[in-house]
Swiss-Prot record:
Signal peptide: none annotated. It is found in: Nucleus. Residues 131-180 form the bHLH domain. Transcription factor required for MONOPTEROS-dependent root initiation in embryo. Transcriptionally controlled by MONOPTEROS. The keyword Transcription applies. Residues 313-344 are annotated as: Disordered. InterPro entries: AIG1-like, bHLH_dom, HLH_DNA-bd_sf. Disruption phenotype: No visible phenotype, probably due to redundancy with BHLH30. It comes from Arabidopsis thaliana (Mouse-ear cress). This is Transcription factor AIG1.
């Protein structure tokens, strides 16, 4: 029995060395759990008299002929039957089972690269396809997460929503947007809201109770502290007085609607002005041309005010950029003191 065990172990050791030479494992001595040079000689006297289940990993490499191995009973629980070595995939599996965790840690020393070099082209293509499939699955998972995040934001924006599925939620969002658009249209028709672009409109509206012509001037521009001060000076230079004013400010934009009339110094100037407009005493006076001149004068004065707003805004942006570049930080924009003036 002992002689048979000794012969089997020696044969197994030679088989293991042949298998190592086949996979060039002699280039990686650090991954082996034992050293082939320091392997002690087999002593039958130290062999256990009461054999237990043989757990030495080298028993997996027993490649003796069937006549020799037939003397072992693989069903007695002492020795496991040797696996088939016919299929190439069994080589890697058998070696991994024999060497255990040490061989698995050996992948960092280049063993996996050596095995990958022995794979066929079809196996490499299959591995690449598997990696691409995993990458696509990960990208699809991130896309679904982004969509769910956006849907959660929409669900939180809606005032009263009980919808949970995506289709119903999107339909409710569309309906809510239509309602907001309708409300915005009503507000725009009722109240004058500033626009994002500068505009100016001057036209003659109607005659007041005294028969004086009232001119309606509407302009929209960037809001600034001295805007109304410039508007007042422009109107005074044209000897105009404001009958009514409507001012709306939203997001740094301002819209002014002014109803203007001629300002008189005395009663004689007032009568002369009315006669010129009515055309009673001055038959050759072209009333329409006079009105066009008056409207053009107001347009030029208010246009200069709007252009000053644009120029000041550009200078303010340049100064802010210069302060940021020089100090490396963001400084608070300087503002001039606002002057409130009232006029009749």
């Amino acid at each position: 029995m002992y002689a048979m065990k000794e012969e089997d172990c020696l044969q197994t050791f030679h088989n293991l060395q042949d298998y190592q030479d086949q996979f060039h494992l002699h280039h990686h001595p650090q991954i082996l759990p034992w050293s082939s040079t320091s392997l002690p000689s087999f002593d039958p006297l130290h062999f256990p008299s009461n054999p237990t289940r043989y757990s030495d990993p080298v028993h997996y490499f027993n490649r003796r002929a069937s006549s020799s191995s037939s003397s072992f009973d693989y069903n007695d629980g002492f020795v496991s039957p040797p696996p088939s070595m016919d299929h190439p995939q069994n080589h890697l599996r058998i070696l991994s089972e024999a060497l255990g965790p040490i061989m698995r840690r050996g992948s960092s020393f280049g063993f996996d690269g050596e095995i990958m070099g022995k794979l066929s082209a079809q196996e490499v293509m299959d591995a690449k396809a598997l990696a691409a499939s995993k990458s696509h699955s990960e990208a699809e998972r991130r896309r679904r997460e982004r969509i769910n995040t956006h849907l959660a934001k929409l669900r939180s924006i809606l005032p009263n929503t009980t919808k949970t599925d995506k289709a119903s939620l999107l339909a409710e969002v569309i309906q809510h947007m239509k309602e907001l658009k309708r409300q915005t249209s009503q507000i725009t028709d009722t109240y004058q809201v500033p626009t994002e672009c500068d505009d100016l409109t001057v036209d003659s509206s109607y005659n007041d109770e005294e028969g004086n012509l009232v001119i309606r001037a509407s302009f929209c521009c960037q809001d600034r502290t001295d805007l109304m001060h410039d508007v007042i000076n422009a109107l005074k230079s044209l000897r105009l007085r404001t009958l009514k004013a409507e001012i709306a400010t939203v997001g740094g934009r301002v819209k002014n609607i002014l109803f203007l009339s001629r300002e008189y110094d005395d009663e004689e100037d007032h009568d002369s002005y009315r006669r010129n407009f009515d055309g009673d005493d001055v038959e050759d006076y072209d009333e329409e041309r006079m009105m066009n001149n008056r409207v053009s004068s107001i347009e030029e004065a208010l246009k200069a005010v709007i252009e000053k707003c644009v120029h000041n805004n550009d200078e303010s942006n340049d100064n802010n950029n210069l302060e940021k570049s020089s100090s490396g930080g963001i400084k608070r924009q300087r503002t001039s003191k606002m002057v409130n003036r009232c006029y009749n």
